[in-house]
Amino acid sequence: MNIVSDVNYATSVAALRMLQASSVLDITEEDFDFLTGDKIWIATDRNRARRCVEACVYGTLDFVGYPRFPAPVEFIAAVIAYYVHPVNIQTACLVMEGAEFSENIINGVERPVNAAELFAYTLRIKAGFKETVIDAEENARQKLRANGLK
């Protein structure tokens, strides 16, 4: 695992925390059931699927009437991992492809991800990156020890 992967994962963890803390989704109960349900999305569901995922990504902005701005891959993948039923994760990645990693947005580099990359990244989030969490905890402990704390 490299530094970029660790930073991307940490960004996704922050996104998951934001999702858990937010109760603002600009989505109907019927659409929420569609998004989280185990019914497989078919081709004719594509627009609804995108609208539902976007409602979770941009819910707060939409609710208060602010304009949307491009969300990074880390946030979109976190939304997909958190809300979309596993049978529809690949489809959600397909309809949401084209986003950029936060680092690229910050650096002004245009490199949109395709569906396969978004899917792979979403799987990493679903898996929890156990080794990343363990490494992060160990790094935090080392910093505390270096500062004289146990």
UniProtKB/Swiss-Prot annotation:
The protein's role, per its UniProt record: Assembles the procapsid by joining twelve 12S pre-assembly complex into a T=1 icosahedral particle, called 108S procapsid. Ten proteins D bind each 12S complex, which are formed by three pentamers of F, G, B protein and a H protein. The scaffolding protein is released from the provirion after genome packaging to form the mature virion.
Source organism per UniProt: Enterobacteria phage phiK (Bacteriophage phi-K)
Additional comment: Phi KhT, a host-range mutant of phi K, can grow on E.coli C and B, besides K12, and is more thermosensitive than the parental phage phi K.
One of the GO BP terms on file: viral procapsid maturation
InterPro entries per record: Scaffold_D, Scaffold_D_sf
Source taxon at top rank: Viruses
Protein name: External scaffolding protein D
UniProt-listed Pfam families: gpD (PF02925)
